[in-house]
């Protein structure tokens, strides 16, 4: 159990049989009446966001999440297959369970799989990944006076904006949290 006074961004709680992550919180102490905590909660499984108010000091069950480092090995009839490299145990996840993370997922990539009550909830990617540019328009020299960008499609199908000098076949580093170009890789 965790007190509503101890809520912080990223805290996970159990409500109505689901896991919720606190994405915003505000401790309110009105001049008249008792204090309360106004929160914005995001469902870890579905991604829906709700606003909920708790009394100050109210005890709420804390969701104890387990993180396991697994390696993505292959795809099998729409399922993503991951392997625990210490026990060689396989875990299968659907595209819905992986969500938006699948646009950066490559074979051999190590990811953290977050589980609750032995059920996988989400996949946490590394903060940055190196991918090959599969498709982009050619950059023309003297195209702009200042730096410009163009869309590029990566080997996984993800689309990011890259500088004009990037060409097909180059390896680039991409921030998985905000889909932004970080630089070239050798």
Swiss-Prot record:
Pathway: Protein biosynthesis; polypeptide chain elongation. Keywords: Cytoplasm, Elongation factor, Protein biosynthesis. It holds the Pfam family EFP_N. It is found in: Cytoplasm. One of its GO terms (biological process) is peptide biosynthetic process. GO terms for molecular function: translation elongation factor activity. GO terms for cellular component: cytoplasm. Involved in peptide bond synthesis. Stimulates efficient translation and peptide-bond synthesis on native or reconstituted 70S ribosomes in vitro. Probably functions indirectly by altering the affinity of the ribosome for aminoacyl-tRNA, thus increasing their reactivity as acceptors for peptidyl transferase. NCBIfam families: efp, PRK00529.1. Belongs to the elongation factor P family. This is Elongation factor P. It comes from Prochlorococcus marinus (strain MIT 9211). The lineage of its organism: Bacteria, Bacillati, Cyanobacteriota, Cyanophyceae, Synechococcales.
